[in-house]
Amino acid sequence: MDKEFDKWNKKKKHINGQSDYLPLYHERQIRWCRLGVNVGFEQDGTGEGFSRPVLIIKGLSRNVCIVVPLTTAIKNNKYFIPLGIVDGKEAAVIISQIRLIDTKRLYKQIKTLDKNIFADIQKAVRNLLS
């Protein structure tokens, strides 16, 4: 499968140039994020905007946060944590794909995750990293 690196690079330059755009965000939010086209098995964004929903795990500053991407291709293993219905589809987070992003990549908020489910995800991330 050919990836659209050149098309994404143009989009990424535009996103990077948005010096006045810094959305306010909070942990537990699920938002659309311009993840782009990535290497190998790293989770890509989809569609014209190269986007997919992400869960904000930790805010580090106004400019950067730690996220995990969502997927509708749910697998039954310790790296996929089910979330239920998100934006009209059954979804899960992929904790093995945890990453730091610039908040310029974030846009439309979808929902705020339930505190109990978020606590389960935090625990799974801690276990992954320990």
List the predicted regions and their residue ranges.
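Short, charged beta-turn/beta-strand-edge "cap" motif at the junction between a beta-strand
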Residues: 36-41
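Loop/turn positions that initiate beta-strands
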Residues: 27-28
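Residue-level recognition of conserved beta-strand positions in structured domain cores
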Residues: 35, 69-70, 97
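Compact nucleic-acid interaction/catalytic patches
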Residues: 43-87
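C-terminal terminal-subdomain/extension
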Residues: 1-10, 15, 23, 48, ...
